[in-house]
Amino acid sequence: MATIKQIQFKRTKVAGSRPTAAQLAEGELAINLKDRTIFTKDDLNQIIDLGFAKGGEVSGDITQIGNYTQTGNYNLTGDATISGKTTTSTLDVGSVSDLRQTNFRPVLSTTTGSNFIISNSGGLIKPITLTVEGTATSSNTILRHSVDTTVAASGFIDSINVSLNPTDGALVTALNGTVNIGSSLKTPKLSVSGAETALGDYSISIGDNDTGFKWNSDGVFSLVTDSNSIYTYSRDRTYSNRPTNFRYTSDFDATTPALAPPGTWLASVETAIDGNAYGDGMSYLGYKDTAGYSFYFRGGGTFNVASKGGFNVDTAAAFAKTVDVSDILTCSSIIKAKGPGQVDVTSAGNIALGGTIQWVPSYMSGSPNRARDTIATAAWGDADQRINVLETSDPHGWWYYIQRAGSGSSSPTGIEGRVNGSWQASDLISDNTLRVAGAFTCTRRNSAGWGDNAGWYAGATPVVANQGNVQEMDPGVGGFYPGFAQYNYNGTGWNQAFVLGLLGQGVQRWRRGVLALRGDGPVDAGQQIARWYFSQEDGSLESEGPLKAPSVQAGQITSFGVNVTNALGSASIAIGDNDTGLRWGGDGIVQIVANNAIVGGWNSTDIFTEAGKHITSNGNLNQWGGGAIYCRDLNVSSDRRIKKDIKAFENPVDILSTIGGYTYLIEKGFNEDGSQAYEESAGLIAQEVEAVLPRLVKISNDGTKDVKRLNYNGITALNTAAINVHTKEINELKKQLKELKDIVKFLTK
């Protein structure tokens, strides 16, 4: 009795497709509608092709009984064996086109030499002597006589063997002994080696096929080794294309360097004919003398060194003649230029000058054609008043000098210096007298005076600057000790003053510095218009008024308010109103406070909100890096009233079949050594979804690179649509299955 498997058909429309043994049950049928073939499986688990139809394939042997008629071409792969005698008036064996790619080899018998080959070029090849009875006619005749060229006996072999190729006209000749050419030898290539030259036309290879002489162009050829051009020779110059090493070797040894004999040289240049015939007039590279190799550069021109790195001499060098430097001579070590009245730099590094140093200023800014005078520094002196003088001047007069005054000088004996003008300096320090011919004179330590009638004050006396007028400042009253005051004096009385001093009471240990602006009257700590106190005890700054600044930098501030008085307590910042801002909530905790209610905050691991508080965003919420979002429920807006152009998915199953589900490792932060860290996860690949549903993929930057992000809400919709299609198909299959069961039940009664 047939089973349901044996009465059903499997179908395909794919050309060339055949079922496998695993796909068919015994006796089950499969139809290829494209190839018009039928298959089944027998009890030996073999697939059987049940018919040829309009074409087909037979897998196995065919035994033909009767005549075989073939219309069309017969293609055979393998050998064709004919048993018995085959009689035919004509046997035409050939190729389907003029381009024959193989030889036809008839096998006449097993006897050696009885077979022959018809080659693809139309020739007949027979392994033994071919005897032609009668006349042999051929458009191309090749006569060949081979000789053993290893036999050296005179007269035994031909003096020349020639092979002529009628296709390309090549003549291959073996020449034994001496070759004499009466006039000239012309050949596009010449190889003095066992292989054809690889240097190109009109070239000569020597030893191997890529070493020798290579013709480049008209009048230009190169000396080549291993296909590398070493020297190139042209009509007016020779080019060295690789490093050139001049050395001396023995007559028959071209590889081992040796020392050249005395009086010889490695390279020379003829320079005697340009008017400078010093010595023998020649220039030498590596002239061998008793000291070794020397180098001579001669000629009527100039020896120029224009290297950006400069001219370097690694060993001690001496100039036996005068060296004239017309421009700039720069030396990073020692220069010795000797001569009377000139420069002498000794081996100890001392420089002796026999005259004046003149400095020519360079143009920096301003008008470029404005005159710039030479600045001179000179050393001189006399034997009595001014023993040694070092002076700087220009054509308009002296600037300054320093000298050792002698016993005949009106100045005190010793070292002194003078400036012919004003002197500006941040500090003037001297263990002796500092004198200025103008308004300032200092004659002892801790004293100062201003003006023609300067008064002198002890160092403990406060310094008072009164717009050019110097007045003694009152010591202060009420425990206030002023140290500095800047007055605005209008000629009729004291007005506003800027005061810096100390404030203390009795023997109080800690005093406070006072920075104040005061009105008219004596210097009293109680009469400041504005004042700031600096505590000696803890370094704090106190102000009786608000501190206004565009920015504040401080090591520690207990609390402060931004445009408001802080009511949040210590370690807090009030912003806008007195109970709204940031407040310290414990070790590592910062609280966000609004109207004295804690809204949220952050600690070392989290940013949090208090219970009952919410985070509301009118834009996107982005989670970067390897973090995750954890929540109990995720509610996404899906109200029909906020949507338009609602359409069902087309072919959701086909779309879903192009998207794979995967497990993988995904980036999650970094390891302690800085390398990328990963964690296990599972999901989809955004690029696969983008290929079929690009609207579900967005690109955003995670701070280091652009990352594609996936709308899984859309994937849920796609899954739902695909499930609906599958549900419909399942219901249809259930209906068909019921019908098949009814048929089977009927057939098996």
Swiss-Prot record:
GO cellular component: virus tail, fiber
Cell compartments where the protein resides: Virion
UniProt xrefs under Pfam families: Peptidase_S74
Region (Interaction with the receptor-recognizing protein gp38): 633-636
Domain of life of the native organism: Viruses
UniProt site (Cleavage): 638-639
Gene Ontology annotations of biological process type: symbiont entry into host cell; virion attachment to host cell
InterPro entries: S74_ICA (IPR030392)
Segments forming domain Peptidase S74: 638-737
Post-translational modification remark: Proteolytic cleavage and release of the chaperone in the host cytosol stabilizes the folded protein.
Coiled-coil boundaries: 720-749
Keyword annotations from UniProtKB, A to Z: Coiled coil, Host-virus interaction, Viral attachment to host cell, Viral tail fiber protein, Viral tail protein, Virion, Virus entry into host cell
Keyword hit for Coiled coil: yes
Family the entry assigns: Belongs to the S16-like long tail fiber protein Gp37 family.
Subunit structure: Homotrimer. Interacts with the receptor-recognizing protein Gp38.
Protein name per the record: Long tail fiber protein Gp37
Organism ancestry: Viruses, Duplodnaviria, Heunggongvirae, Uroviricota, Caudoviricetes
